[in-house]
Amino acid sequence: MCNVSQDSCNIDSRLDSLFPPTLYIFVMVIGFPTNCLSLWAAFVQVRQKNELGVYLLNLSISDLLYIATLPPWVNYFLHQDNWIHGPESCKLFGFILYTNIYISIGFLSCISVDRYLAVAHPLKFAKVRRVKTAAVVSAVVWAIEIGANSAPLFHNELFEDRFNHTFCFEKYPMEDWVAQMNLYRVFVGFLFPWVLMLFCYQGILRAVKTNVSTEREEKAKIKRLALSLIAILLFCFAPYHLILLSRSVVYLGQPCDCTFEENIFTAYHVSLALTSLNCVADPILYCLANEGARSEVTRGLAPLMKFFSASRPNMDSFARSVTLDTPWSSRRAAAPSPRSWSLCGQTGGRGRRSRVRRRRDCKC
């Protein structure tokens, strides 16, 4: 163990006082309303007995909790990494901030597995894909991530640097238990879910490719959505966990060497800020690009649409903008083709006739 003092690393916290707070403000402005819409749309799907809505609901709650912690962190970075709200609030907001990263990843994994079962094995796992099962799985995800990331609640997380700034959830060099916890976060909290998601979406692509009844346009839509998810997951979370792993490995090898910490400090904070973009990507990829959820959002915004656009009789163009069509969602159709597959997650009807139809159409 390194016995150097807590301010032995000459960290200049003034270097990153612009980018993180700017990005956090952007995420709050965009992420809060879109996740509120996602929350409402997911709730509607849950009421329709759609198990995908359960995961979307929990994902939106996780993102909103994350966004709720951003204002004090904006203040923290604007004051050059100086926490002024006391030790208990540091523990609380830091715990929520870091834990929700992995809760979000956990529910993205749940959605990936659910979509894989729906597309690749629509009949074999039909009984597993139920609202009650999704609720139990969601409770397990919350319990595991909260328990696995609760250690900082029992340690002092305020540390002063050479500028008399009070760091929150940051110590340079880090402590032994933090380095070990970081390894768990990297391999269990990030790498394992990412490999699982990659496996699921490769299975989805194989199932779509081998099914001759799937239309070409629908195949392209599913592939774009799948590949875009992997890309955004890598963009939002991979840089942070790569740097986190590097910091932990270097510390465990040379606990008293601050050179690496000093050189990578700004990059570490930038990568941490990039994880917040997941709160903007989630509702676009998994809710607003969803046929059922998109129609619910459009219908829910209809009163506001009429109120703010009373002088504009033609509402068609506005309705198209509300759907937030992205490169991952093709233009909206009047009704899904009976020969096409979808990642919509809509629950079919009960009974023998619906099962025969599902077997013939191979739909979600």
UniProtKB/Swiss-Prot annotation:
Any GO BP: cellular response to acidic pH
Annotated S-S bridges: 9-258, 90-168
Membrane topology, Extracellular segments: 1-8, 81-85, 157-172, 251-260
Means of activity regulation: Activated by a network of residues that connects an extracellular-facing cavity to Glu-145, a conserved charged residue buried in the transmembrane core of the receptor. Protonation likely drives conformational changes in extracellular loop 2 (ECL2), which stabilizes movement of transmembrane 3 (TM3) and a series of rearrangements that connect the extracellular-facing cavity to Glu-145, a residue only conserved in proton-sensing G-protein coupled receptors.
Site (Proton sensing): 155, 165, 269
Result after altering residue 119 to A: Decreased proton-induced G-protein coupled receptor activity
Domain of life: Eukaryota
Positions of transmembrane segments: 9-45, 50-80, 86-121, 130-156, 173-210, 215-250, 261-289
GO molecular function: G protein-coupled receptor activity
Positions in the Cytoplasmic compartment: 46-49, 122-129, 211-214, 290-364
Result after altering residue 122 to A: Decreased proton-induced G-protein coupled receptor activity
Cross-referenced InterPro entries: GPCR_Rhodpsn (IPR000276), GPCR_Rhodpsn_7TM (IPR017452), GPR4_orph (IPR002276)
Localisation: Cell membrane
Region (Extracellular loop 2 (ECL2)): 157-172
PANTHER family (alphabetical): G-PROTEIN COUPLED RECEPTOR 4 (PTHR24234:SF10), LYSOPHOSPHATIDIC ACID RECEPTOR 5/SPHINGOSYLPHOSPHORYLCHOLINE RECEPTOR (PTHR24234)
Function of the molecule: Proton-sensing G-protein coupled receptor activated by extracellular pH, which is required to monitor pH changes and generate adaptive reactions. Ligand binding causes a conformation change that triggers signaling via guanine nucleotide-binding proteins (G proteins) and modulates the activity of downstream effectors, such as adenylate cyclase.
Entry domain remark: A multitude of proton-sensing residues, which include extracellular histidine residues or triad of buried acidic residues, contribute to activation of the G-protein coupled receptor activity and pH sensitivity.
Protein name according to UniProt: G-protein coupled receptor 4
Gene (UniProt): gpr4
